C-alpha cells in the first residue's frame, strides 16, 4: 500500500466540452497514415473521419471519440519509439545492440494493452513493424469495431488473430483470452492512459499482471506508455463515486516498480529493473480529456453521457471534468532484465 499522503484537489470545476462537432484539421501524422496505410485520399479524410466518429459516438459517447482524441498517436511520440521500438519490431535484422528477450525476434510479441481504436498499432505497422507479432487488447470490443471502420484493414490485419477484447487487466486467470494469447510472450508492452485510472494498490496489481504477460527468457523487456501524472505524487479523490486514483511523478513511479519486483520475487528471477519518466508541461485540454474518460468509464457521468448520446448538435454543449493542480502529462518506461 502507498504511504504517500492523499493529495488535495481544491480546484473548482472547469467547463469541459465532451463533444466537438467539427474537426478543424486532420493532424498530419494520422493524415499520412490514412492516405498511405488505409488508402483514403486527403480530400476524403475529414468526411470519412467525421462519419466514422459520429456513428460511433451515437452508441459509445466516450470523450476520446467526441473530442477527436483518437486521432493522436501517442506511441510514436514516446522517446523510445524511434530509437528502440521501431527497430526492434521491424522486419530487418535485429538491432546491432541486441534484441529483446529471447535473443530472436520470432520469440516474442508486441502488445498494446488498452489499445483503444488500435491507432498506435496501425502507425507501428506503417513504420515498418512486423504485423504478425503485433497485438492489441482493450476492455471494450466496440473500440476495435470503430478502428476497423476507420482504417479499413480487416482483410490484412484480421481481428481474430490480433485483437483481444474484452480484456480485463485484473484477470490473472490462465483461461482468459489475454492469458492464452499473450502470457509469457510479450517483449514490448505499450499501455497509455490505463495505469492512471486506478489507485496505488490497483496499479500495483496491474503491474503484476503486466509481468505475467512478459517473456522471461534471458534478455531485456520493455513496458512503456503515457499517463496523467502530477508533480506532487499521491492519491487524488474522485469527484464522484468515492475512491481515489494515484497520480505519479518519476520518483513514485520508480518506487512502485521496486515494490512490484519485491512482491513478485518468488515468481520471477529479476536481475534488474529500471523505471523512468519524463513530465511534460501542463496541457489542460489533454488532461481534462483523460479525467472525463475516467469518469465516464467508471460510471460517474452517466447523465452527461446520456445527453451526449442523444444530442450532438453544434448548439448543445455538454461539460464534465475538473482540472487537478500540479497535473502533467507523463511519458514512462520500465526496463526489466530477467535472469
Question: Regions from the language model: what does each represent?
Answer:
Residues 2-178, 203, 209, 217-339:
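Class I (Rossmann-like) S-adenosyl-L-methionine-dependent methyltransferase catalytic domain
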Residues 184-202:
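A short SAM/SAH-binding and catalytic strip from SAM-dependent methyltransferases
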Residues 198-199, 214-218:
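Helix-to-beta-strand junctions that scaffold the AdoMet/dcAdoMet cofactor pocket
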Amino acid at each position: 500500500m502507498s504511504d504517500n499522503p492523499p493529495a488535495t484537489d481544491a480546484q473548482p470545476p472547469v467547463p469541459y466540452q465532451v463533444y466537438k462537432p467539427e474537426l478543424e484539421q486532420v493532424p498530419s501524422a494520422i493524415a499520412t497514415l490514412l492516405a498511405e496505410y488505409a488508402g483514403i485520399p486527403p480530400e476524403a479524410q475529414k468526411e470519412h473521419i467525421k462519419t466514422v466518429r459520429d456513428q460511433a459516438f451515437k452508441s459509445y459517447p466516450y470523450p476520446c471519440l467526441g473530442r477527436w482524441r483518437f486521432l493522436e498517436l501517442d506511441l510514436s511520440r514516446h522517446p523510445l519509439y524511434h530509437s528502440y521500438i521501431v527497430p526492434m519490431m521491424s522486419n530487418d535484422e535485429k538491432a546491432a545492440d541486441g534484441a529483446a528477450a529471447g535473443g530472436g525476434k520470432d520469440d516474442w510479441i508486441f502488445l498494446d494493452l488498452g489499445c483503444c481504436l488500435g491507432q498506435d498499432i496501425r502507425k507501428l505497422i506503417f513504420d515498418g513493424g512486423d504485423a504478425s507479432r503485433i497485438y492489441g487488447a482493450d476492455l471494450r470490443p466496440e473500440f476495435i469495431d470503430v478502428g476497423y471502420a476507420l482504417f479499413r484493414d480487416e482483410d490484412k490485419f484480421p481481428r481474430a488473430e490480433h485483437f483481444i477484447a474484452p480484456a480485463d487487466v485484473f484477470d490473472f486467470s490462465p483461461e482468459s483470452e489475454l492469458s492464452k494469447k499473450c502470457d509469457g510472450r510479450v517483449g514490448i508492452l505499450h499501455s497509455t492512459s490505463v495505469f492512471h485510472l486506478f489507485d496505488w494498490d490497483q496499479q500495483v496489481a496491474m503491474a503484476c499482471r503486466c509481468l505475467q504477460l512478459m517473456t522471461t527468457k534471458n534478455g531485456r523487456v520493455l513496458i512503456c506508455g503515457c499517463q496523467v501524472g502530477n508533480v506532487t505524487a499521491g492519491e487524488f479523490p474522485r469527484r464522484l463515486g468515492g475512491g481515489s486514483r494515484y497520480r505519479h511523478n518519476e520518483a513514485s513511479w520508480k518506487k512502485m516498480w521496486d515494490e512490484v519486483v519485491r512482491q513478485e520475487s518468488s515468481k520471477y528471477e529479476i536481475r534488474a529493473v529500471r523505471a523512468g519518466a519524463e513530465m511534460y508541461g501542463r496541457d489542460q485540454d489533454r488532461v481534462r480529456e483523460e479525467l472525463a474518460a475516467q469518469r465516464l468509464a467508471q460510471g460517474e457521468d452517466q447523465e452527461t453521457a446520456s445527453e451526449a448520446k442523444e444530442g450532438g448538435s453544434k448548439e448543445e454543449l455538454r461539460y464534465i471534468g475538473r482540472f487537478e493542480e500540479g497535473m502533467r502529462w507523463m511519458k514512462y518506461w520500465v526496463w526489466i532484465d530477467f535472469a
